[in-house]
């Protein structure tokens, strides 16, 4: 990297940091963190374990916001020192290499911080629950479902999020009939809510002996994981429970007793299941949490549809409304039909490179709320 290029890059970073600083009341944030930490030192703090954990989680969110900003400022200050050293000795390859690597890392961190500023919905900070449901199309569709399962797992791992498989049903020949995963990490739902909808896949099918092109569809549902502080009324009479033998991905660790639980909410037809816990009671409890999350999400969607009807916005739902297409033949492209963002690197996307699509979606959502 040329020194002049590094100077321009650092100058742009400084402008971004000043913009971030203008939206962050550091003094108020520091006082809020101190208040939380004072509460954590009180003798009766652990009397209510659930409440104590919530205080700790909220404090960690604030500390993460503060530390992320301070980390950016420290990185840019270090880059300024490296530029001074490089100017004094332009032939020092070690300094130039450190400068180039530092600029790349700082830019990546600034992009990530900027992305977080777009997360403004009430439950964006929560963990995310993703349900993957292949459409009709046999083995090709179930294999596409497995590809999406892998894509989201890769994306989560790249962001140091934890992934837990809550429910997994393998396809007859390949892939999955359905899967539910939980992504645990700060802002997981805020990032992944962009993935809710129908994903279209076009390729020459490896399962077709004639080598023909196939189009497959998979529906992805995304909801925030809700805690008990969110009240969602569910009548016992409205819920039907079925039990089954649970097993892991690919048929691993199949239980000899029926510990898996499937709940059907009869008024809405919503079905959820859980196999993640070791006991039937544990799976019923977790499945009920999933059901409440889905009912809450359904209520939000109703309100959004009502709002859209009043403002004249067009709402698209169902299998006919693909949000994104992944084309491997006759050309290579991934395109989001909401934002029009596209790339000609489908394999990178399938390997978890979703951030550009997430960023474009969040920017698009912001433009809908603030047209001017």
Swiss-Prot record:
Offer a single GO CC term for the protein: cytoplasm
PTM annotation? Methylated by PrmC. Methylation increases the termination efficiency of RF2.
- Where is the protein localized? Cytoplasm
Q: What is the lineage of its organism?
A: Bacteria, Bacillati, Bacillota, Bacilli, Lactobacillales
| Protein's recorded name | Peptide chain release factor 2
Name any one GO molecular function: translation release factor activity, codon specific
> What are the protein's UniProt keywords?
Cytoplasm, Methylation, Protein biosynthesis
The record's function comment reads: Peptide chain release factor 2 directs the termination of translation in response to the peptide chain termination codons UGA and UAA.
Name the source organism: Leuconostoc mesenteroides subsp. mesenteroides (strain ATCC 8293 / DSM 20343 / BCRC 11652 / CCM 1803 / JCM 6124 / NCDO 523 / NBRC 100496 / NCIMB 8023 / NCTC 12954 / NRRL B-1118 / 37Y)
Q: Which residues does this entry mark as bearing N5-methylglutamine? A: 252
Where is this protein primarily located? cytoplasm
Enumerate the InterPro entries for this protein: PCRF (IPR005139), Pep_chain_release_fac_I (IPR000352), Pep_chain_release_fac_I_sf (IPR045853), PrfB (IPR004374)
Give the family, as the similarity comment puts it: Belongs to the prokaryotic/mitochondrial release factor family.
């Amino acid at each position: 990297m040329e020194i002049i290029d590094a100077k321009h890059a650092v100058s742009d970073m400084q402008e971004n940091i000043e913009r971030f600083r203008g939206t962050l009341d550091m003094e108020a944030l520091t006082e809020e963190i101190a208040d939380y930490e004072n509460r954590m030192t009180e003798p009766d703090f652990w009397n209510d374990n659930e409440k104590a954990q919530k205080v700790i989680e909220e404090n960690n969110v604030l500390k993460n916001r503060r530390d992320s900003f301070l980390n950016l400022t420290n990185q840019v200050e270090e880059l300024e020192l490296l530029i001074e050293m490089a100017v004094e000795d332009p032939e020092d390859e070690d300094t130039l290499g450190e400068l180039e690597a530092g600029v790349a890392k700082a830019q990546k961190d600034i992009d990530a911080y900027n992305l977080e500023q777009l997360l403004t919905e009430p439950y964006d900070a929560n963990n995310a629950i993703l349900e993957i449901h292949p459409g009709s199309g046999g083995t090709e569709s179930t294999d596409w479902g497995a590809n999406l399962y892998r894509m989201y797992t890769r994306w989560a791992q790249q962001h140091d999020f934890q992934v837990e498989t809550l429910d997994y049903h393998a396809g007859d020949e390949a892939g999955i009939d359905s899967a539910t995963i939980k992504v645990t990490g700060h802002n997981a739902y805020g990032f992944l809510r962009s993935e809710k909808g129908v994903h279209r896949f076009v390729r020459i099918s490896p399962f077709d002996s004639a080598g023909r092109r196939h189009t497959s569809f998979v529906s992805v549902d995304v909801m925030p994981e809700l805690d008990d502080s969110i009240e969602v009324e569910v009548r016992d009479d409205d819920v039907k429970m079925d039990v089954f033998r649970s097993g892991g991905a690919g048929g691993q660790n199949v239980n000899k007793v029926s510990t898996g639980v499937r709940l059907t909410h009869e008024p809405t037809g919503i079905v959820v299941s859980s196999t993640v816990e070791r006991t039937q009671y544990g799976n019923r409890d977790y499945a009920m949490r999933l059901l409440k999350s889905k009912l809450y999400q359904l209520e939000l969607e109703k309100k959004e549809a009502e709002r859209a009807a009043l403002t004249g916005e067009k709402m698209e739902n169902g299998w006919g409304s693909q949000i994104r297409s992944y084309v491997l033949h006759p050309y290579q492209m991934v395109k989001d039909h909401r934002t029009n963002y596209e790339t000609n690197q489908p394999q990178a996307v399938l390997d978890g490179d979703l951030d550009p699509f997430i960023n474009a979606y969040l920017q698009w959502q912001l433009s809908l709320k603030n047209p001017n």
